[in-house]
Amino acid sequence: ASVKRHNPGLLSNTGGSRIRVELREVCNLDSSNISPIVWENLAGTIRDNYDDFDALIVLHGTNTLGYTGAALSFALVNPTKPVVITGSQVPSGLPATDAAMNIEHAVRVAVWPGGDISRMAGVVGVFGSHIIPGTRLKKTTSFDYDAFRSFSSESIGRIGRLVNIDEDKLSKHKSYLHTGLNPPARRQADLRVEPEFDARIA
């Protein structure tokens, strides 16, 4: 609702009345406070609404957007529809916000290449001009609109006047979707292992 208020032309830029949009609020908190419980609730909301929509878009704060992209990638088992996660560097309603642009880009990717059936599938991040696998989202800057990049692999595609998808990278992304993993554990730690590390510490 806030995006439409600040940018009434958003839907007309992405298909207008041909696109039906419904909103579900899973939580409203600073993304720095996102936890595995929220990931479970978000994944559950996606599953509950999965059959009713052609694509699902998640709006998320940037601090932990990459973590949520990875969590959803492993929590959702072999999704055949696009689950697109995006956010903004500048909040909606402030001057020079990129919120409307990123949502427009997310919709364009979700319906790519146009027509009745999207060829995009699985969890992807859309931010600035980059389309990134959900497992590869890394925030690299707090200042530029292209805030996220794909680490250890290239982006699936780029967005400009057209949505340009690398078909080989998209095919590889789709082949990586099936996981069937359990919900994420709620007690986690990141341990950096060095020579002579005592395993009893873990």
Locations of regions flagged by a protein language model:
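ATP/NTP phosphate-donor binding region
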Residues: A1-D48
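Accessory alpha-helical/coil subdomains and C-terminal extensions
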Residues: A1-G15, P133-A202
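Predominant activation on well-ordered alpha-helical scaffold segments within soluble catalytic domains
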Residues: K4, E40-A43, R47, G69, ...
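Short helix-terminating capping/connector loops at secondary-structure junctions
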Residues: G15-R18, P79, D116-M120
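Conserved beta-strand scaffold positions in the cores of enzyme catalytic domains, especially
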Residues: V21-E25, V83, G125, A199-I201
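Structural motif
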Residues: D54-A55
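Short Gly/Thr/Asp-enriched flexible loops that form oxyanion-binding sites at enzyme active sites
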Residues: V58-K81
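Internal gly/pro-rich beta-alpha loop/helix module
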Residues: T86-S171
